[in-house]
């Protein structure tokens, strides 16, 4: 294995807008959980200094981002960053726009920010350039990664020639591909193999390591929860195999939120999370993880998570196991789509009332890309997830029950072996089923009977109780029952917000 001369971050804070409550850094007086683009610089600093995250993702994809982030961090917190240097001790990692999926207006701005940050750090006598790697979301091919590297290199040379006197900018960045769908996650080793070859042809050098990002939210939105977790597990196993074959260290990152549908990483489920993501080296602690639990609990959970990730070992699978899981994933995606297509129109009014937490660009038109499932325009994963929880039908159930019921003995044995928390997860999720709300939905659209069948199938296999188990869950269920009956959008938003606080996440 190659020697790595950098710290690999284990804990990555992100700007995912899934928090129900008010962020701790806004102070006791604030009642507003919304975080403006301007406040995100304060947020980044607090993630480093108060929560001790190793890394913070700065998102240029489909949202407004402050290009002055490095100027402000260094100017406002010079003493801190003198002792905790960006690029050496702490890491700010840009998520670039994908120019193949959306208009890349902000790509050049992000790249020039990276270059000017290097100048600023040099002027302050910092030894490491602060921004040296970037995430490419929705990565599909090795050529895309090389093209982004080429654009950065050309821009660096142009800036050095035309705008920088006396010193040159570094002309390369390290790319972190973000694989979002089941297919790209499954075939990530093949894409990376091509990328390594192209990189060597282009530079004459070999890479000392790779960081690879696996999505946990959009994959669930696109193909359902069962398909998504199988995709993550297969990718982690295959990346480990590829790492061994190439004698190349690979450090997987998972983009996971507090809901089980989006990966199930919350301060109360660290052990569960580590069991379900064997071989993972970096986890995203999103906004709900950081802001919807007491600060001391969050700090303690981050320490536990870091320790666990540093010792987290990959799990091997036989070819037979992998092939069986691929077939199970396909079955489950089919069940998910069959049901979801008939329900999506009923949810539109809930999506529209969903509370906002960040300065995002509109998800339509020329500025942002729009995710589509079976031709339907879908909201972002957080909105989708929270909306289904809010109507008393956790999205984890959709398609999962019938898919599980259809498995033969071998398929069931292999699936449950690689999903050790299956029973515990769904026993917990069943607390958020509102029987009254579901019956109201069925009365308006009989297609909701399929979701009810999923719940019943899972209950018959796993033997759990349906409905609330405490006062907070009872109130959540009552609010779900109210939500599906009212028509006023403002009241809908208020009810969704109340439910989010009760369950410790927005979506």
From Swiss-Prot:
Its cofactor is Mg(2+). InterPro entries: PEP_COase_arc-type (IPR007566), Pyrv/PenolPyrv_kinase-like_dom (IPR015813). GO terms for biological process: carbon fixation; oxaloacetate metabolic process; tricarboxylic acid cycle. It comes from the Bacteria. GO terms for molecular function: magnesium ion binding; phosphoenolpyruvate carboxylase activity. Keywords: Carbon dioxide fixation, Lyase, Magnesium. Pfam families: PEPcase_2 (PF14010). Residues 1-25 are annotated as: Disordered. It catalyses: oxaloacetate + phosphate = phosphoenolpyruvate + hydrogencarbonate. Disulfide bonds: none annotated. It is an enzyme of class 4 (lyase). The keyword Ion transport does not apply. Its EC number is 4.1.1.31. Signal peptide: none annotated. SUPFAM superfamilies: Phosphoenolpyruvate/pyruvate domain (SSF51621). Belongs to the PEPCase type 2 family. Catalyzes the irreversible beta-carboxylation of phosphoenolpyruvate (PEP) to form oxaloacetate (OAA), a four-carbon dicarboxylic acid source for the tricarboxylic acid cycle. Homotetramer. HAMAP family: PEPcase_type2. This is Phosphoenolpyruvate carboxylase. The lineage of its organism: Bacteria, Bacillati, Bacillota, Bacilli, Lactobacillales. The gene is ppcA.
């Amino acid at each position: 294995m190659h020697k790595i001369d950098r710290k690999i971050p284990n804990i990555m804070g992100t700007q995912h807008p899934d928090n129900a409550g008010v962020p701790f850094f806004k102070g006791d007086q604030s009642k507003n959980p919304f975080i403006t683009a301007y406040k995100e610089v304060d947020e980044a600093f607090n993630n480093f200094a108060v929560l001790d995250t190793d890394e913070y993702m700065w998102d240029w994809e489909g949202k407004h981002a402050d290009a002055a982030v490095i100027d402000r961090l260094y100017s406002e917190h010079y003493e801190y960053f003198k002792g905790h240097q960006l690029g050496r001790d702490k890491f700010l990692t840009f998520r670039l726009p994908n120019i193949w999926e959306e208009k890349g207006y902000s790509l050049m701005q992000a790249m020039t920010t990276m270059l000017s940050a290097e100048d600023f750090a040099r002027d302050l006598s910092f030894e490491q350039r602060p921004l040296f790697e970037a995430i490419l979301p929705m990565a599909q091919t090795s050529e895309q990664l090389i093209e982004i590297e080429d654009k950065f290199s050309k821009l660096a040379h142009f800036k050095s020639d035309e705008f920088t006197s006396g010193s040159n900018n570094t002309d390369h960045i390290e790319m972190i591909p973000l694989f979002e769908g089941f297919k790209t996650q499954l075939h990530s080793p093949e894409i990376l193999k091509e990328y390594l070859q192209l990189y060597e042809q282009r530079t004459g050098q070999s890479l000392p390591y790779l960081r690879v990002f696996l999505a946990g939210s959009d994959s669930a939105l696109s193909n359902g929860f069962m398909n998504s977790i199988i995709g993550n597990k297969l990718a982690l196993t295959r990346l480990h195999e590829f790492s061994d074959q190439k004698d190349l260290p690979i450090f997987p990152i998972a983009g996971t939120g507090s809901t089980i549908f989006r990966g199930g990483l919350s301060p109360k489920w660290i052990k569960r999370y580590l069991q379900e993501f064997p071989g993972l080296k970096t986890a995203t602690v999103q906004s709900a993880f950081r802001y919807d639990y007491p600060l001391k609990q969050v700090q303690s959970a981050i320490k536990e998570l870091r320790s666990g990730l540093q010792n987290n070992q990959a799990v091997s699978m036989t070819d037979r196991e992998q092939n069986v899981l691929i077939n199970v994933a396909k079955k489950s995606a089919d069940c998910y789509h069959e049901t979801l297509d008939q329900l999506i129109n009923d949810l539109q009014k809930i999506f529209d009332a969903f509370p906002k937490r960040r300065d995002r660009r509109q998800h339509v038109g020329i500025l942002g890309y729009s995710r589509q499932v079976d031709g339907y325009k879908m909201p972002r994963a957080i909105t989708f997830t929270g909306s289904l929880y809010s109507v008393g039908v956790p999205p984890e159930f959709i398609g999962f029950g019938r898919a599980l019921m259809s498995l033969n003995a071998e398929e069931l044995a292999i699936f449950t072996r690689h999903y050790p928390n299956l029973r515990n997860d769904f026993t917990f999720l069943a607390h958020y089923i509102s029987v009254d709300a579901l019956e109201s939905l069925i009365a308006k659209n009989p297609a909701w009977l399929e979701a009810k069948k999923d719940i019943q199938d899972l209950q018959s296999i796993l033997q759990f109780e349906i409905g609330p188990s405490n006062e907070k869950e009872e109130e959540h269920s009552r609010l779900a029952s109210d939500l599906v009956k009212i028509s006023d959008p403002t009241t809908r938003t208020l009810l969704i917000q109340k439910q989010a606080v009760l369950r410790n996440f927005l979506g």
